[in-house]
Structures are given as structure tokens and as C-alpha cells.
Amino acid sequence: MNFKYIIAVSFFIASAYARRNEKDVQSLSQRDVLEEESLREIRGIGGVLLSAGKAALKGLAKVLAEKYANGKRTAEDHEVMKRLEAVMRDLDSLDHPEEASERETRGFNQEEIANLFTKKEKRILGPVLGLVGNALGGLIKKIG
């Protein structure tokens, strides 16, 4: 009788241990799924914010380009217009990165491609902020 009791208790302990391990594995996989879902949500929100920022920059660049295109331009205004056109091309290439990267990277090796994209990011953000500041400063001077 004692032997049957020992076997039954051992079986009960082993099955309880197995169930606990199974639940731990399930909770880990559920946690991974939840983390992945939250990462997708964060990426979605980031994508929406990036799209809104790009749209705002494009709109501002178009307004500034129209302003400079309709009036008489000095050499400085002409230079600003050229920069705005370059910014517009860069912003358009952000909307269609595959096409832009195919055009820009033909004949480059992988290291040059990585350097090109790093330079492109710097080339877009720096001048955009500078141009927006200069254009707004120029508009304020002309209005005031």
C-alpha cells in the first residue's frame, strides 16, 4: 500500500511540475505576442507621425516655393528656390525610397550605399530646418 501511495504522489508531483512548466512557456509566448503587438502599435504611431511631419514639410516647402516663384527673385532668392526644389526632391524620395535608392545607388558598393544614406539623412534634416528658418525669417522681415 505504501508503495502505491508513493507512486501516486510521485506521479501527482511530476504532473503538477509539468503543468507549471507548460504554463510558464505559455505565459512567455503570450508575453512575446503582447510585446510584438505593442511594438507594432508603436511603429504604426511612429509611421503616422512621420507621414504627418513629411506632409507638413512638403506643404511648407510648396508654399515657400510658390512664394518665391511668383515674385521677382534676387540671386539670394534664386538660391533659396534651388534649395527648396532639392528639399522637395529629397522629401519625394522619402515617399518612394525603393525608386530613389535604385536611381542613386547604381554602381556603388555596399559601404558607399550605407554612407550615401547616412549623408542623405543629414542632407535632408539640416537644410530643411535651415531653409524653413531662413524663409520664415525672410517673410517676417518683408511683412514687418
UniProtKB/Swiss-Prot annotation:
Please tell me in which tissues this protein is expressed: Expressed by the skin glands.
Cleaved propeptide residues: 19-43, 74-123
Q: Which InterPro entries does UniProt cross-reference here?
A: Bombinin
The secretion signal range is 1-18
Q: Show the stretches that span the lipid bilayer.
A: none
Cell location: Secreted
Instruction: List residues modified as Asparagine amide.
Output: N70
Positions carrying Isoleucine amide are: I143
Keywords of the record, alphabetical order, are: Amidation, Amphibian defense peptide, Antibiotic, Antimicrobial, Cleavage on pair of basic residues, Cytolysis, Fungicide, Hemolysis, Secreted, Signal
Q: Record's Pfam families? A: Bombinin (PF05298)
The GO biological-process annotations, alphabetized, read as: defense response to bacterium; defense response to fungus; killing of cells of another organism
One cellular component (GO) term of this entry = extracellular region
According to its UniProt entry, the function of this protein is described as: Maximin-4 shows antibacterial activity against both Gram-positive and Gram-negative bacteria. It also shows antimicrobial activity against the fungus C.albicans, but not against A.flavus nor P.uticale. It has little hemolytic activity. It does not possess a significant cytotoxicity against tumor cell lines. It does not possess a significant anti-HIV activity.
**Family named by the database record:** Belongs to the bombinin family.
**What name has this protein been given in UniProt?**
Maximins 4/H3 type 2
Species of origin reads Bombina maxima (Giant fire-bellied toad)
Classification of source organism: Eukaryota, Metazoa, Chordata, Craniata, Vertebrata
